[in-house]
């Protein structure tokens, strides 16, 4: 992502799979700053970072969807989100969490504790609507029960504060993780279809 550092000097901004964001001077390739944006140990970044108005908007997802395929993994405590950073220095401006913190919800077939709500990853690049001062993002499924009303949904956030303005859920009760591929212990009861809204939201004017 091409951004500016506040002095009209360009920056190249990118993220790695461990949820660290880097800003690099494109002329010298020197790292201007580095920011740790992990919400959890399993946080990752799969979409590009959006830039608008001197700020960066980072989509947070989680590879716990795959880790849950291991029956020894205690499922599931992570969730997705959006984090806003100051492009000048990487300072965190606000963060939006896709679910509340997970709490114990019972046990799996093997007697291990299960936690929820979880999931609702932001897999793709957030869409900026400058005219309305909004950010739009698509969300993934829940990884464990209880299901939330913003999984498999489009969410609209205020660009300045990160507050949720509205949401539209396309598919309700989609609770799924990789344990469902082989009937593993972490597969939720009444598992959903693993639908997600995996692509970026398209902002267009309809005549």
Segments (PLM) and residue ranges:
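Noncatalytic, solvent-exposed loop/strand surfaces
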Residues: 1-207
């Amino acid at each position: 992502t091409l951004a500016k550092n506040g002095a009209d000097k360009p920056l190249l901004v990118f993220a790695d799979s461990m949820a660290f964001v880097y800003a690099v001077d494109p002329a010298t390739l020197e790292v201007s700053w580095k920011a740790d944006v992990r919400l959890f140990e399993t946080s990752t970044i799969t979409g590009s970072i959006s830039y608008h108005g001197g700020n960066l908007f980072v989509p947070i997802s989680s590879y716990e969807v795959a880790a849950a395929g291991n029956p020894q993994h205690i499922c599931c405590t992570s969730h997705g989100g959006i984090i806003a950073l100051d492009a000048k220095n990487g300072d965190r401006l606000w963060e939006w969490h896709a679910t509340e913190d997970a709490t114990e919800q019972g046990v799996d077939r093997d007697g291990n504790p299960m936690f929820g709500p979880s999931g609702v990853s932001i897999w793709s690049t957030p869409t900026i609507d400058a005219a309305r001062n909004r950010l739009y993002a698509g969300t993934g499924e829940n990884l464990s029960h209880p299901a939330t009303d913003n999984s498999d949904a489009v969410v609209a956030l205020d660009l300045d504060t990160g507050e949720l303005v509205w949401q539209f859920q396309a598919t309700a009760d989609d609770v799924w993780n990789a344990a469902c591929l082989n009937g593993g212990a972490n597969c939720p009861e009444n598992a959903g279809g693993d639908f997600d809204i995996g692509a970026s939201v398209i902002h267009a004017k309809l005549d």
